[in-house]
Amino acid sequence: MTRGTNLVGPFLQHDAGLDYYGRRLATCSSDKTIKIFEIEGETHRLIETLKGHEGAVWCVAWAHPKFGTILASSSYDGKVLIWREQHQNATSPVAGSTWTKVFDFSLHTASVNMVSWAPHESGCLLACASSDGHVSVLEFRDNSWTHQIFHAHGMGVNSISWAPAASPGSLISSNPGPGQQRRFVTGGSDNLLKIWDYNPESKTYNLSQTLEGHSDWVRDVAWSPSILSKSYIASASQDKTVRIWTSDASNPGQWTSQQLEFDTVLWRVSWSPSGNILAVSGGDNKVSLWKENLKGQWEKVKDIEE
């Protein structure tokens, strides 16, 4: 995923995301549109332009294919839109498929900066982070959407990322934990990270932990998909640092952080699918890759110039 680095014509492209199979690429930009490309080998072909937002589109996110071909988008206009690809009848004279806007959520009173789908094991859940200070969680069940919305960060929420559905250590423990967890982390303009846990009895998301350390806005957060013995959260900040927060399965409420320093404001952090390599991108259009060594220190393994 990239954010705020490429120009498509005269408009700044804010985000890009590949679908689960790597066959479709969605991009979004300041021109209020979302573009869908088909990827074939080294080539890509524009197949659809989606129009529906009334402001710059900041974020696009594909749902897991078990829920269908579904894309979520969020914008400066305060809206979250859900798009679905409908395949034409095989006997139809019009071949191919069409994209339709199936839901239009106007829950927020300011820009929605990021949307993030939960691990598919938890259900069809979308978490949304807004400059109005609130987080909303949308859930699709039985052909209808329900939502929850709650206050998260006083000065606005910039980013959001779900924890893996299985708790750390559950794969290698003889006594696995209580099944699927619904948990995510948010990053705010109050310089804080906050971890939220779902309570199935009250059916609410409750603040379980606040992580302090950054001295400026937290621009992005990313929870590692790894479910071995530790949990990792990476955070990128306006303070020119990335922090990697670690919690051991033996002491799950305890988080320690390691700071990585950079020469530029940082925009984005992203884990590899296995959760052991971290990509960091910032204002200098460079991407660096980081890995933990055997001593538990994070080392840069590669620089990629865009």
Swiss-Prot record:
Broad class of where this protein is predominantly found: membrane
Record's keyword terms, sorted: Cytoplasmic vesicle, Endoplasmic reticulum, ER-Golgi transport, Membrane, mRNA transport, Nuclear pore complex, Nucleus, Protein transport, Repeat, Translocation, Transport, WD repeat
GO molecular function: structural molecule activity
Cellular localization per UniProt: Cytoplasmic vesicle, COPII-coated vesicle membrane; Endoplasmic reticulum membrane; Nucleus, Nuclear pore complex
Record PROSITE patterns: WD_REPEATS_2, WD_REPEATS_REGION
Record-level GO cellular component terms: COPII vesicle coat; endoplasmic reticulum membrane; GATOR2 complex; nuclear pore outer ring
A biological-process GO annotation: mRNA transport
WD repeat ranges per the UniProt record: 2-47, 52-93, 107-148, 152-206, 213-255, 261-300
Topology with respect to the bilayer: Peripheral membrane protein
Described function: Component of the coat protein complex II (COPII) which promotes the formation of transport vesicles from the endoplasmic reticulum (ER). The coat has two main functions, the physical deformation of the endoplasmic reticulum membrane into vesicles and the selection of cargo molecules. It also functions as a component of the nuclear pore complex (NPC). NPC components, collectively referred to as nucleoporins (NUPs), can play the role of both NPC structural components and of docking or interaction partners for transiently associated nuclear transport factors.
Quaternary structure and interacting proteins, as annotated: The COPII coat is composed of at least 5 proteins: the sec23/24 complex, the sec13/31 complex, and the protein sar1. Component of the nuclear pore complex (NPC). NPC constitutes the exclusive means of nucleocytoplasmic transport. NPCs allow the passive diffusion of ions and small molecules and the active, nuclear transport receptor-mediated bidirectional transport of macromolecules such as proteins, RNAs, ribonucleoparticles (RNPs), and ribosomal subunits across the nuclear envelope. Due to its 8-fold rotational symmetry, all subunits are present with 8 copies or multiples thereof.
Family as reported in the entry's similarity comment: Belongs to the WD repeat SEC13 family.
The protein's name: Protein transport protein sec13
Species of provenance: Aspergillus fumigatus (strain ATCC MYA-4609 / CBS 101355 / FGSC A1100 / Af293)
UniProt lineage: Eukaryota, Fungi, Dikarya, Ascomycota, Pezizomycotina
Gene: sec13
